[in-house]
């Protein structure tokens, strides 16, 4: 009888302990919160409590008996799918430029740099998903997030370099082509990639919020001060691109006006071409701004205590810019279209005329 009572008491203690653990997990923001947030860190208790910043380690959920499986966040799945599409598109562009001697010109070197940066960004999104759920650790988180920062910084820098190249090709049309060399373009890209790599190494070298959770940004483990620097750099790049595209539009309209004076009227073909060119520039800049501006603004005004869904909802569209870049800067180009046909069809003779286009053409 005493043994039965003791067994009953032990069972009650186990039940009470289990209920207390479940309540504690719920209070700490566990699976019962019902929100799409980031996976909670394994050592959350030592970090000072849960918050809404984008975490980089996975939360464990119950699987088969004796096995714990990571609970997959649907937002992370979307980012991984986006990264897969980005990597596939840009890998094709890099392969086309690398395998076609006619595409090894300064203009296509810039496009190749953009495609390489976007390819690395896509691979980084895939690796982030894999490591987050298979090898969750703070060291791996720092490496993957630094890799993504460097890749996206190189992508934005390459876009700026392409914009500068287009502006100079129009503003100094008579002398720019003779002065522009592959060596100069390579030196420019080497400088931009060095700066981008430095921005990506900062979290790994210690500029992170692992030691002080209150200093975290909306993307953990990036420190709020580091994210503020990245956002300020983006706003500066966006402002320069906006100014240059406005200047490009002014040059285009001035050339159209000169043609009109020579011909005493602006012929409909010239007017249509001018409007089309200005419209294309608006699409290019609008796509870039619509993709990155929401995330850059939220990085400045957001807090690590805000729901993580806000971070995901602004970060996902930012990745779409790397998905659209190959379409805008590569696949619309006739030389790349011809190289693609030759790659897919072997000795197929494309009917697309091989005409060298200037960097001012989108």
From Swiss-Prot:
Q: Which residue spans belong to the Cytoplasmic compartment?
A: 95-106, 165-185, 250-277, 332-362
Please verify whether the record's keywords include tRNA processing.
no
Report the residues modified as Phosphoserine: 356, 358, 360
Give the sugar-modified residues. 2, 9, 51
Q: Which InterPro entries match?
A: GPCR_Rhodpsn, GPCR_Rhodpsn_7TM, GPR6, GPR_3/6/12_orphan
Instruction: Show the GO MF annotations.
Output: G protein-coupled receptor activity; sphingosine-1-phosphate receptor activity
Q: Which GO terms describe its cellular component?
A: cytoplasm; plasma membrane
Q: What's this chain's function? A: Orphan receptor with constitutive G(s) signaling activity that activate cyclic AMP. Promotes neurite outgrowth and blocks myelin inhibition in neurons.
Could you tell me which PANTHER family the record lists for this protein?
A: G-PROTEIN COUPLED RECEPTOR (PTHR22750)
Q: Which family does it belong to?
A: Belongs to the G-protein coupled receptor 1 family.
Q: What protein name is recorded for this chain?
A: G-protein coupled receptor 6
Instruction: List the source organism.
Output: Homo sapiens (Human)
């Amino acid at each position: 009888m005493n043994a039965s009572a003791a067994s009953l008491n032990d069972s009650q203690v186990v039940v009470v302990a289990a209920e207390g653990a479940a309540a504690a997990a719920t209070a700490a923001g566990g699976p019962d919160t019902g929100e799409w947030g980031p996976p909670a860190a394994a050592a959350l208790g030592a970090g000072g409590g849960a918050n809404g910043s984008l975490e980089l380690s996975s939360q464990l959920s119950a699987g088969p008996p004796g096995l714990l499986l990571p609970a997959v966040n649907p937002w992370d799945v979307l980012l991984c799918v986006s990264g897969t599409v980005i990597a596939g598109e840009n890998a094709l562009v890099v392969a086309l430029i690398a395998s076609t001697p006619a595409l090894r010109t300064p203009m296509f070197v810039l496009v190749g740099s953009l495609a390489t940066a976007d390819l690395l960004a896509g691979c980084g999104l895939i690796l982030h998903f894999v490591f987050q759920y298979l090898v969750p650790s703070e060291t791996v988180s720092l490496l993957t997030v630094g890799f993504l920062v460097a890749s996206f910084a190189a992508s934005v820098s390459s876009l700026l370099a392409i914009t500068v190249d287009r502006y100079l090709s129009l503003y100094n049309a008579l002398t720019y082509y003779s002065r522009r060399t592959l060596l100069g373009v390579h030196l420019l890209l080497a400088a931009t990639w060095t700066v981008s790599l430095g921005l990506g190494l900062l979290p790994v070298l210690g500029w992170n919020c692992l030691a002080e959770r209150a200093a975290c940004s909306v993307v953990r483990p990036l420190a709020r001060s580091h994210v503020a620097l990245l956002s300020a750099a983006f706003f500066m790049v966006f402002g320069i691109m906006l100014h240059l595209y406005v200047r490009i539009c002014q040059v285009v309209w001035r050339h159209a006006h000169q043609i009109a004076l020579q011909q005493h009227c602006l012929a409909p073909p010239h007017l249509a071409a001018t409007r089309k060119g200005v419209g294309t520039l608006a699409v290019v800049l609008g796509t870039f701004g619509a993709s990155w501006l929401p995330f850059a603004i939220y990085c400045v005004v957001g807090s690590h205590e805000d729901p993580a869904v806000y971070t995901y909802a602004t970060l996902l569209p930012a990745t779409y810019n790397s998905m659209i870049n190959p379409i805008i800067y590569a696949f619309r180009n006739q030389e790349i279209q011809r190289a693609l046909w030759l790659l897919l069809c072997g000795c197929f003779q494309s009917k697309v005329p091989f005409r060298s286009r200037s960097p001012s053409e989108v």
